[in-house]
């Protein structure tokens, strides 16, 4: 992963110049983002693009990998056949679609 790729994700996560966990699992989160999490695992073809990354605290990162069923439901993990650019994830309590420029858009609700 390049410094630029890492910076894009950690800039998206920053509030007042401090990277804050993008996952924020209630009752688990340690708040400060210190790790990069690949939504689609590298072993499944995941890249280092911003849409495939979340800045997370160590506690949420551990929770994701210990609770994979929930992580796939929340979009924190992405299946090998899916595209992270098209897979919403729960970011700080809101479902969003991440882009490769370091931004995100709220998921459109369907009826």
Please report, for each region that a protein language model flagged, where it lies by residue:
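Context-gated lysine
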Residues: 3-4, 40, 74, 79
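Short cysteine-rich loop/turn motifs with clustered Cys
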Residues: 2-35, 54-60
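Histidine-centered nuclease catalytic patch
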Residues: 22-55, 66-74
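Arg/Lys-rich, low-complexity, intrinsically disordered N-terminal tails that contact nucleic acids
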Residues: 1-9, 104-111
């Amino acid at each position: 992963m390049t410094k630029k790729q890492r910076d894009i994700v950690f800039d998206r996560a920053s509030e007042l110049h401090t990277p804050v966990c993008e996952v924020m699992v209630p009752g688990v989160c340690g708040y400060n983002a210190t790790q990069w999490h690949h939504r689609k695992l590298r072993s499944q073809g995941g890249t280092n693009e911003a849409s495939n990354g979340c800045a997370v605290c160590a506690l949420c990162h551990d929770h994701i990998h210990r609770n994979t069923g929930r992580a796939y439901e929340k979009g924190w993990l992405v299946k090998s056949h899916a595209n992270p650019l098209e897979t919403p994830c729960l970011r700080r309590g809101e479902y969003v679609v991440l882009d490769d420029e370091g931004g995100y858009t709220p998921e459109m609700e369907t009826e």
